Curated annotation (Swiss-Prot):
Zn(2+) binds at H71, E74, H169. This is Succinylglutamate desuccinylase. The keyword Nucleotide-binding does not apply. It comes from Pseudoalteromonas atlantica (strain T6c / ATCC BAA-1087). It catalyses: N-succinyl-L-glutamate + H2O = L-glutamate + succinate. Transmembrane segments: none annotated. The gene is astE.
Length: 350
């Protein structure tokens, strides 16, 4: 039974749509699950602060997860998804498929930092229970909460649904290829070319094929639930309100069409339209004196001749193994034991 305060909250959301603002500023109001019907055609379920789902009353064939803010300072995807939620709650968008929105690291958003204590995107597939992390941290509790929300969301559908998860990010540094996606390791399954075409329609033409299991959010959804899942990098980190949203027109429009069931008119896959890379080296930091041997502002996907020194630390030097080997996500400031650089080389899809 809903209280007077709950009715006021629901009315406020339908008028203003400000679920994310409410989650960040008055999280206690959405701490407990709340469900209501939107305009007699969509079931709304507030799971917890920053986690909300929408389900059309008409049966659909897709279950979609859109996540943003897994790193709190990656603002453009947060702003995109926030606007979707506002538009759905206020009736400007009508969803055609079940969709779960996750705004990941709320305290880090307030601090304008990637995380508070732990990198949330290294805590999935139960890594939050590892002895190597602070299990009392906000991020460990949040990773567990997010895993449970995703499991419940996918599990509450019917067996004929196709599952999708787009984990939206922006990168610390600029990139030679501004928008790119990481395709999680598939354990021998085929990469889906229709998904590549879909992301190409979003303005993403560069794909990095992961070569091993990881503890990222997209790998969790892919491995545990068979979802078409990607970590999608949409550009460079900017402060809230400082993003040039015209740079996100393609991804914004395509995702909006996808969740509202409008035709996508995807181009057939052609390997000439995309750049495909595979991971060659995963370079982890083993000592406090780990140091990159290139500029801190070097763009992602910058490449090097074979033998070039990429990084060093006590007892180790790390060099390019191939001509044209490129670096992605270099970050010397990670914790010991975590990935400091990915190196990638060009490849093709089977």
């Amino acid at each position: 039974m809903q209280t007077v305060n709950t009715h006021k909250l629901i009315s406020h959301l339908q008028q203003q749509g400000q679920f994310l603002t409410l989650s960040r500023c008055s999280g206690e109001l959405v701490q407990n699950p709340i469900s209501f019907t939107l305009y007699e055609h969509t079931q709304v379920s507030i799971i917890s602060p920053g986690i909300i789902s929408f389900s059309p009353k008409i049966k659909s064939d897709k279950a979609i997860v859109l996540s943003s803010g897994i790193h709190g300072n990656e603002t453009a995807p947060i702003e995109i998804c926030d606007q979707y939620v506002i538009d759905i709650l206020t009736g400007k968008i009508r969803v055609a498929h079940r969709i779960l929105f996750i705004f990941g690291n709320l305290p880090a958003m307030d601090r304008a930092t990637r995380f508070v204590d732990e990198n949330l995107n290294r805590l999935f597939s139960h890594a939050h229970a590892s002895e190597s992390v602070d299990q009392n941290s906000y991020e460990c509790a949040r990773a567990k909460e997010i895993e449970e929300a995703v499991a419940e969301f996918y599990g509450s559908g019917h067996g004929e649904e196709s599952r999708y998860h787009y984990d939206l990010h922006t990168a610390i540094r600029p990139s030679k290829n501004e928008k790119f996606a990481v395709y999680p390791f598939l354990h021998g399954e085929k990469h889906d070319k229709e998904q590549i075409s879909f992301l190409l329609a979003c303005g993403i033409d560069t794909f990095l094929l992961s070569g091993s299991p990881t503890t990222t959010f997209s790998y969790y959804s892919s491995r545990q639930f068979g979802a078409h899942a990607f970590t999608v990098e949409l550009g460079k980190v900017q402060a809230f309100g400082q993003n040039d949203m015209s740079r996100f027109t393609q991804v914004n429009d395509t995702l909006k069409r996808f969740i509202s069931g409008q035709p996508l008119n995807l181009k057939s896959f052609n390997d000439q339209d995309v750049l495909i890379y595979q991971v060659n080296q995963v370079i982890n930091k083993h000592a406090e004196d780990f140091e990159l041997d290139f500029s801190d502002d070097l763009p992602n996907f910058s490449d090097f001749p074979k033998g070039t020194l990429l990084a060093h630390e006590t007892g180790n030097e790390y060099r390019a193994e191939f001509d044209g080997e490129a670096v992605v996500f270099p970050n010397a400031n990670v914790a010991i034991g975590q990935r400091a650089i990915l190196t990638v080389i060009p490849t093709t899809l089977d």
